[in-house]
Amino acid sequence: MKILQIVPSISLVYGGPSQMVLGLSSALAKAGVEITIATTNSNGDVGQAPLDVPLGVPVAQNGYEIYYFRCSPFRRYKFSIELLQWLHKNSKAYDLAHIHALFSPVSSCSAAIARSQQLPYILRPLGTLDPADLQKKRQLKRLYAAVLERPNLAGAAAIHFTSEQEAKTSERFNTVTRDVVLPLGVSLPPSASSSIHEKYGIPKNKPILLFMSRIDPKKGLDLLLPVLENLGSDFHFVLAGGNPQDPSYEATIRDRIQYSQLKDKTSIVGFVTGGEKTALLEAADLFVLPSYYENFGIAVAEAMSVGTPVVISDQVHIWQDIERSRSGWIAQCNVESLTQALKEALANRVEQIQRGKNAQIFAQQNYSWDAIAQQVIKTYQDLI
């Protein structure tokens, strides 16, 4: 079975949704599936240099191969004419395409090419069909959907959602297409040295609250910061993440902290990867993500995998898994509910530890790439 994964970018700066493709591809290759990834060399949207990678030739990695193509002519939108030309020429070599992201020109055009070449394809929306997300640039998206995404959805072999709630709430533009619900997996590198506290000025004698995600309005920082400012408990807040697509919003959040009472109890560490990311997740007593909408929440699963309990909103679409497994605390998207959840979580260290253990067990059983790969393979086989 030969599968083509198409994704606008796999640069680290785009976070979990892009990195998921690498984890899935590695697990599928390990299970004997021939995997090719077609992507661009995009490495951020504002001023960053593109990835320094070979272009248009296969690059071997973890049992699969990657073709990188130059972003041109619309670099900001991760568009590549060369990728589309390659796909048109090589689509017959594959049994199925798994296309990641909607409302992204290279993905949308790839789906249209796959359809014209009779190559079955699965679409993974990455939360772009959430009604809240569709409100952003609403008129443009309605036009885009009418011209491109509605035919793409109608012609897809299946739509890949990562949670039951995402499947339930997503807009289909009056199309009827098979749903498949397949969660995302986590695979963290070994933890860095124990010097993480010293490096970032994180005290060892206070509860650590960690926010690790893209610094974006949808992540609920406008709720979290006022809650922390008035929480009254003794804690230290770690803000980890960045936003190369909207650096002005990131700067606004940094300034808000700098000029508030949180200044002396906050470490702003920026975008972290590798062993340092793992070390921060392990060092945290609570992982906090009060998003307004989140189709899965890969960072939540990563925190759970190292035994850190989570405090999340009921708009993170795996919240019911967290609630059933008692892996953390659930809040509504308002200041009062989030305050109550954090106070309850901080009040009982014994309960924190127990819910952290529950989280790790649940993640091992449900967010393992090897187990998820078997579900994905069965789905591929059903669709080919």
What are the residue ranges of the model-derived segments?
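Short hydrophobic beta-strand element within catalytic cores of glycosyltransferases
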Residues: P309-S313
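Aromatic "clamp/platform" in nucleotide-sugar-dependent glycosyltransferases that forms part
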Residues: Y292
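Conserved donor-binding/catalytic core segment of Leloir-type glycosyltransferases
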Residues: L4, H160, I202-K219, L225-E229, ...
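Conserved acidic donor-binding segment of nucleotide-sugar-dependent glycosyltransferases
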Residues: G328-E336, E344-V350
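Membrane-proximal helix-turn-helix segments that form the acceptor-binding/catalytic region
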Residues: S116, R142-A158
